[in-house]
From Swiss-Prot:
Ranges where the record places region Disordered: 1-54, 353-381
Protein name as annotated: RNA exonuclease NGL2
Biased composition regions of type Basic residues, renumbered to the chain: 40-52
Bias-annotated ranges (Basic and acidic residues): 21-34, 369-381
A Gene Ontology molecular function term of the record: RNA endonuclease activity
Length: 515
C-alpha cells in the first residue's frame, strides 16, 4: 500500500457516525506511521539518494496494536447495533429488545421465557407470494437465520407453527437437542407441515400429551363448515428437581405448566370455522386440565396445580369473533365482528377440500371461484344476513357462552405498560399492531394466552389490568419481546435478507410463576 493512499474501513450494518469515528482512528494511525518513517529517512538518508525507511520491531508492534484498536472499534460498533460481527451479513436478522417490567422487584418464583413463532413452512413457499424475498427464501440460509434467532432470544418453552415434517426430522430435532431442548411434533397426515413444542430439558419433563384434530371434534349442534386438516398439540410439562432446588424447595403444590399450540384455519372467509375451532381449543384445554388432575394429582379437584398456557397462530385479529369469543365473555357479537362472521356463513366451500391432499394449504390460494352466490369481500361494509345465517351466528355465541372457560392474552394485559405507542393502535384490547408482515397482508395473528375457568355469572368482557391479572393468577409478566408497529416496517414483505426469516414475527413473554 502506498503512503498517499487513504485507508478506509467499512463495517457492514454500522451507523455512518460510527464508521466516521472508526476511519478517523485508522487515518490518525496512518499519519503517525508516515511521520515516523519520514523522520527515519531524514536521519539515515544522504543528499541526492533515497533510502528505505527502517522497520523496527517496535514499529511493527505499534502498527499491530493500532490495527487491533481499529478491529475492536468496528466490532463494538456492530455489537451496539445488535449485529453479530461473527455472523455473515446474509445471516443477520433484526434483533429486537426485551421491554422489562418489575425491574426493581427481586425474583422469588420460577422465571422462564415463553415464545410463539410461525416459521413459514418451506413446503408452502411460492415465489409469486414472496416477490421481494429473493435468497431469503432458500432453506440453507433461512434455517440458519431461524436457528440464530432461537439462540439469541433463548426462550425456555417454544411453540412453533408451520414446521415442515421433513425439516423437523432432519434438522430441527437435532439442532434443538444440541441446544438442550426436548420436543413434540404433530401434523395432519395430509399436510407437509405441522406444529411443535420445544422445552428446555433441564427445567421440565413431559408427563402427558393430548392431540387435537379440529375436523373430528364435536361442537354441540354446530357442524364443521369444511375440512380444514388443522391440528393442535397440548403437553403437561412438570417442573424438574432443579427448578425446585433453585427455589430452595423440596416440593411444591405447583407441579408445572400445561402448554398448547395450534395453527387455525387460514381461509379469508373462514371466520365462522375459526370461531368454532377456538371453542374446541378451550373445550380441549378444560378436558386436559381435568385429565392431568386425575392422573397427576390424585383427582383432588384442585386445578391450580398447573399453569395453563396456549399459544399459536390463530389467523384472527383482536376485533374478530375467534379472538373475542375466547377473551371477551360473555360473548356478544356486534358491529364489524358480527358483519364479518355473518358474511362468512354465506360462503360455500368447495367439496374438493373434503379429502383432497393439499387442497387447503395455507397461502395456497382459494380453490373456490368467486361467483354470483359468493360474497365478494370477507370484510364487507354491510351484510344482511338471512334467517338461517343469523341463527348460525347466534348459535356460535351461545356455544361459547355455554363453556366455562376463557383465555387472557398476555400481550393484551401487559404490553401497554412497556410500549404504549404500539398498544391498541388498531384495536381496543391493548394488542400490538402486527405479528405478520407478508406481501399481500399485514396484521396481528399470533397470541400467547393464559387459559382459566370462567364463571358464567361474571362479566369478563373488558381487558383486566396487569396488576389484577398477576395477583389473581400468581403469574408475573417481567417483560415482552418488542413488537414493531407497522410504520417501522419496510414496504416490502417478509422474509427478507438481513431482516426477518419468516413472514411472521416471533413473540416472547418473560414470565415469573409463584410456586
Amino acid at each position: 500500500m502506498t503512503q498517499d493512499k487513504e485507508v478506509k474501513v467499512v463495517a457492514p450494518d454500522v451507523a455512518p457516525d460510527q464508521e466516521v469515528e472508526i476511519n478517523k482512528s485508522v487515518k490518525d494511525a496512518k499519519h503517525q506511521t508516515n511521520d515516523d518513517s519520514l523522520l527515519q529517512h531524514k536521519k539515515k538518508g544522504k543528499k541526492g539518494k533515497k533510502s528505505k525507511p527502517i522497520v523496527t520491531p517496535e514499529h511493527i508492534a505499534k502498527v499491530r496494536a493500532e490495527r487491533e484498536v481499529m478491529r475492536k472499534a468496528k466490532r463494538d460498533a456492530m455489537l451496539a447495533q445488535g449485529v453479530d460481527p461473527d455472523c455473515p451479513p446474509e445471516l443477520h436478522f433484526i434483533r429486537r429488545p426485551f421491554l422489562s417490567l418489575h425491574e426493581a422487584e427481586p425474583v422469588t418464583g420460577f422465571r422462564f421465557k415463553l415464545m410463539t413463532y410461525n416459521c413459514l413452512a418451506q413446503a408452502l413457499i411460492r415465489r409469486k407470494l414472496f416477490p421481494d424475498s429473493g435468497d431469503a427464501l432458500k432453506w440453507y440460509r433461512r434455517s440458519k437465520v431461524l436457528l440464530n434467532e432461537f439462540k439469541y432470544y433463548n426462550s425456555d418453552v417454544i411453540c412453533l407453527q408451520e414446521i415442515d415434517h421433513i425439516q423437523f426430522q432432519s434438522f430441527w430435532k437435532d439442532e434443538f437437542s444440541k441446544l438442550g431442548y426436548d420436543g413434540q411434533y404433530y401434523r395432519n397426515a395430509t399436510k407437509n407441515h405441522g406444529v411443535a413444542i420445544m422445552w428446555r430439558r433441564e427445567l421440565f419433563h413431559q408427563v402427558d400429551k393430548m392431540l387435537i384434530d379440529y375436523d373430528k371434534e364435536s361442537s354441540e349442534s354446530i357442524s364443521t363448515r369444511t375440512t380444514t386438516n388443522n391440528v393442535g398439540l397440548v403437553l403437561a410439562l412438570k417442573f424438574s428437581e432443579k427448578v425446585l432446588s433453585n427455589l430452595g424447595k423440596k416440593s411444591s403444590k405447583k407441579c408445572g405448566i400445561l402448554i398448547g399450540t395450534t395453527h387455525l384455519f387460514w381461509h379469508p372467509f373462514g371466520t365462522y370455522e375459526r370461531t368454532r375451532q377456538c371453542y374446541i381449543v378451550l373445550k380441549k384445554m378444560k378436558e386436559f386440565m381435568h385429565r392431568v388432575n386425575v392422573l397427576q394429582n390424585e383427582n383432588d379437584g384442585d386445578l391450580s396445580h398447573w399453569f395453563p398456557f396456549f399459544c399459536g397462530d390463530f389467523n384472527s385479529q383482536p376485533f374478530d369473533t375467534p379472538y373475542l369469543s375466547m377473551t371477551s365473555k360473555p360473548v356478544h357479537y356486534r358491529n364489524r365482528a358480527k358483519t364479518v362472521i355473518g358474511c362468512s356463513t354465506s360462503y360455500k366451500f368447495s367439496k374438493v377440500r373434503d379429502g383432497e391432499e393439499g387442497a387447503d394449504d395455507e397461502e395456497g390460494g382459494n380453490i373456490e371461484k368467486y361467483g354470483k352466490d359468493q360474497p365478494e369481500s370477507p370484510v364487507p361494509e354491510k351484510f344482511h344476513a338471512n334467517e338461517e345465517q343469523s341463527e348460525l351466528v347466534d348459535k356460535m355465541a351461545q356455544l361459547h357462552n355455554s363453556l366455562d372457560m376463557r383465555a387472557i392474552s398476555l400481550y393484551s394485559v401487559g404490553y401497554k405498560n412497556v410500549h404504549p405507542e404500539n398498544a391498541g393502535l388498531d384495536n381496543d384490547r391493548g394488542e400490538p399492531e402486527i405479528s405478520n408482515w407478508a406481501n399481500t397482508w399485514r396484521g396481528l395473528l399470533d397470541y400467547l394466552f393464559y387459559v382459566k375457568k370462567w364463571d358464567p355469572q361474571s362479566n369478563c368482557q373488558e381487558v383486566e389490568t396487569l396488576g389484577d391479572f398477576e395477583k389473581e393468577n400468581k403469574v408475573k409478566c417481567r417483560g415482552f419481546l418488542r413488537m414493531p408497529p407497522g410504520n417501522e416496517m419496510t414496504k416490502h414483505g417478509q422474509p427478507h435478507v438481513g431482516e426477518y426469516a419468516s413472514d411472521h414475527l416471533s413473540m416472547v413473554c418473560d414470565l415469573e410463576l409463584q410456586l
